[in-house]
Amino acid sequence: IVPIVSAADGPKPALVRFADAEAERKLVASLVEQRYRTQSVAVLLRTHEKIREIKPYLPASAVLLKEEKGGWTAGHGAYYGTYHGAKGLEFDLVVMPFLSRENIPDLSDSEPDEVAEISADDTGLLYVGVTRAKSSLVLTCTGDVTELLPADDALYNRSSR
């Protein structure tokens, strides 16, 4: 994802790097807990496996996003799902955890000639995720951040925990 010009006013996305995954999950939980009663907050993830990993950290009232948007009503609350499930929707705060180099792109079962295609697909998915944020975007990772996000430090408010 190579930004040319920022199309939106507002704060830079936060990019928070963790030493361990449990601390990352706890920050996601804290961000959702702080804001979901007054704002729409979405936790967007790459895979259903990651959804299962984060679900226990979310409020019991959190709503799973589905690709079929029938009956969708916007409003404050906690939402979670895949990047695909959020397509076409917007949220006040979007949290995108697990953006480490080891998770995205997922090259675990790929052949060398598939790497470029998989990376392009994952870049498109990241684009869908980051563009769901109306006012705040928080990106998190444990270890090194994926190379699919721009490396320019000027684009983020970076921190480590």
Enumerate the predicted regions with their spans.
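A short acidic (Asp/Glu
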Residues: R52-Y57, F91, L149-D152
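Short, solvent-exposed loop/turn segments at secondary-structure junctions
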Residues: A21, H48-I51, G85-A86, S100-R101, ...
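Active-site regions of enzymes building and remodeling cell-envelope glycoconjugates
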Residues: P59-L64, A78-G81, D152-R161
